[in-house]
């Protein structure tokens, strides 16, 4: 049953990787047998030991992402609990449909199973009903993308040819794309300083975006030349042409780009916004509120904030962590904080921000995302932090929530985890798959 729930969670896109779970009987696992013997040797069974036994020993090596392991252990705690043993008709979720039937004859279990709905409600997996909408949207998008790829490339009547469409689109993007940043001007105005790590962050961001815009500009110029017969249409340019024709970001761009799942039009708009934010920073100095989603490499900004605090207060940076304060302001702050930074641009998926009670709350029906107000990053010594009545919410760059597993044990799509005030136990939001996203897909 646990395997079925985990695979369904993956289908509903609340887990990060497709699970390749151990298919043999759990009892055959040597570590499980060893711990099982130590459990049954006691007169009172240790239910609490079963969760880590199965979660860490049986599945631990196969579920490599630590956020997936957290979800796995949370789901296990639903099944390995004294309430399930002691209560008759133990309910697995809200409502009267899904529960563990009371002890009875074999046929009573069969009758209960036959009474269950054919299509399971997301609540049985701990998810909000909106999870079905997310799944259906993604399946529909995949279907439409496949249909687009099968359409003929010839146009009839007075419609524009594919070549004309791509050429006009290329010229439009080129007209909007700004010139590369002058690295030397940035270095002269914001030199490397021990007291201000943000200067280094800015310079690194400018260099990264220059590389990206150079690839975008060169590919668009060459596409226009190839369509006019001035140069040969290489396989790389053909890939750019085909991607632009169906509204996708070309692989050549994605290889040099920050992670993004946006279609081509939204991607270009987003890129131009990021470039403008950097230009404003260069012209007017560091903003009072940083657009967290606008950084090419978000971790460098977080490291810069930590370094500034560590150097100012002469504390080893290894001892530094962040506390988080969700403010009531949505877009603007009058002054910069003395320590830390204000950030904006995060979207909450799987829950919403209750602005009245200043805690995370249940999503409203058919509203999949909720923008978070400005958040204050407050660096400090980690051993002095108090972690009470919070949900440790992971932040991802895109809604895919998956990437390459890095040496830290986190996905490359993962940014950090922020503590959000909550009036419910963490388990509730873990099962909901609640996370923050730096950008949406549209």
For each feature predicted by the language model, list its residue ranges:
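Long C-terminal appendages of very large multidomain proteins
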Residues: 4-6, 14-442
């Amino acid at each position: 049953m646990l395997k079925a729930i985990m695979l369904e969670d993956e289908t509903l896109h609340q887990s990060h990787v497709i699970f390749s779970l151990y298919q043999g009987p759990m009892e055959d696992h040597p570590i499980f047998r060893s711990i099982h013997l130590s459990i049954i040797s006691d007169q009172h069974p240790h239910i609490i030991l079963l969760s880590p036994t199965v979660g860490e020993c049986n599945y631990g090596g196969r579920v490599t992402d630590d956020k997936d392991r957290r979800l796995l252990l949370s789901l296990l705690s639903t099944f390995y609990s004294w309430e399930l043993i002691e209560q008759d008709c133990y309910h697995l979720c809200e409502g009267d449909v899904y529960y563990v039937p009371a002890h009875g004859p074999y046929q009573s279990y069969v009758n209960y199973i036959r009474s269950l709905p054919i299509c399971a409600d997301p609540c049985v997996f701990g998810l909000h009903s909106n999870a079905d909408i997310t799944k259906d949207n993604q399946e529909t998008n995949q279907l439409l993308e496949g249909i687009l790829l099968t359409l003929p490339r010839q146009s009839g009547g007075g419609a524009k040819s594919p070549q004309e469409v791509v050429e006009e689109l290329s010229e439009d993007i080129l007209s909007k794309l700004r010139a590369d940043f002058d690295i030397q001007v940035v270095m002269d105005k914001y030199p490397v300083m021990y007291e201000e790590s943000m200067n280094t962050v800015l310079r690194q961001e400018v260099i990264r975006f220059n590389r990206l815009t150079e690839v975008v500009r060169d590919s668009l110029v060459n596409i226009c030349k190839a369509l006019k017969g001035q140069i040969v249409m290489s396989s790389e340019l053909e890939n750019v042409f085909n991607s632009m024709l169906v509204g996708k970001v070309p692989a050549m761009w994605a290889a040099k780009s920050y992670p993004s799942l946006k279609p081509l039009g939204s991607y270009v708009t987003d890129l131009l916004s990021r470039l403008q934010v950097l230009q404003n920073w260069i012209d007017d100095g560091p903003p009072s509120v940083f657009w967290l989603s606008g950084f090419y490499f978000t971790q460098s900004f977080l490291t810069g904030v930590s370094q500034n605090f560590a150097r100012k207060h002469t504390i080893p940076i290894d001892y530094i962590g962040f506390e988080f304060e969700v403010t009531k302001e949505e877009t603007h702050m009058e002054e910069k904080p003395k320590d830390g930074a204000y950030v904006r641009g995060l979207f909450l998926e799987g829950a919403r921000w209750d602005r009245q009670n200043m805690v995370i709350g249940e999503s409203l029906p058919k509203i999949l995302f909720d923008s978070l107000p400005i958040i204050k990053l407050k660096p400090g010594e980690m051993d002095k932090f108090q972690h009470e009545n919070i949900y440790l919410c992971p932040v991802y760059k895109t809604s895919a929530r998956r990437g390459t597993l890095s040496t830290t044990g986190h996905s490359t799509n993962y940014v950090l985890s922020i503590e959000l005030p909550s009036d419910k136990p963490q388990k509730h939001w873990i099962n909901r798959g609640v996370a923050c996203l730096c950008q949406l897909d549209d």
